[in-house]
């Protein structure tokens, strides 16, 4: 008899394609695992973007003067927050509309965050 040889399932790590994605290529042909890894990365990126949007709202006192664009998110760094004119607070106190707008955006942020978390947990 031949000595015991492990099957392919016992020799392959659980998610080998994650290292492959970082290196720029896939190391597995399993479609479901590849899809899981893409969902994982996409969910993480979306959650980070939503957190940056919330940070913009907090810094800006709930008033964004229009929609938050990808440019705002891209340039939101600790060094540029203070210097960017768009993020400087207006003089005077916040009125009721600005506070209501902030709470609406915050609720929408929490809802989208929970949606991304549910998608992530579904594939784990």
Swiss-Prot record:
Q: What does the miscellaneous comment read?
A: Partially overlaps EHT1.
- Lineage, highest ranks first: Eukaryota, Fungi, Dikarya, Ascomycota, Saccharomycotina
* Descriptive protein name: Putative uncharacterized protein YBR178W
């Amino acid at each position: 008899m031949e000595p015991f040889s492990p099957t392919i399932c016992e020799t392959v790590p659980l998610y080998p394609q994650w290292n492959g994605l970082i290196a720029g290529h896939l190391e597995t042909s399993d479609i479901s695992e590849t899809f899981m890894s893409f969902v994982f990365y996409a969910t993480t990126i979306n959650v980070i973007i939503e957190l940056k949007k919330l940070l913009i709202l907090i810094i800006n006192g709930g008033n964004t003067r229009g929609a938050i664009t990808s440019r705002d998110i891209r340039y939101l760094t600790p060094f540029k927050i203070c210097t960017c004119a768009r993020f400087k607070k207006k003089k005077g106190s916040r009125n009721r509309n600005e506070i209501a707008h902030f709470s609406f955006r915050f609720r929408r942020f929490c809802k989208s965050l929970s949606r991304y978390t549910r998608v992530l947990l579904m594939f784990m």
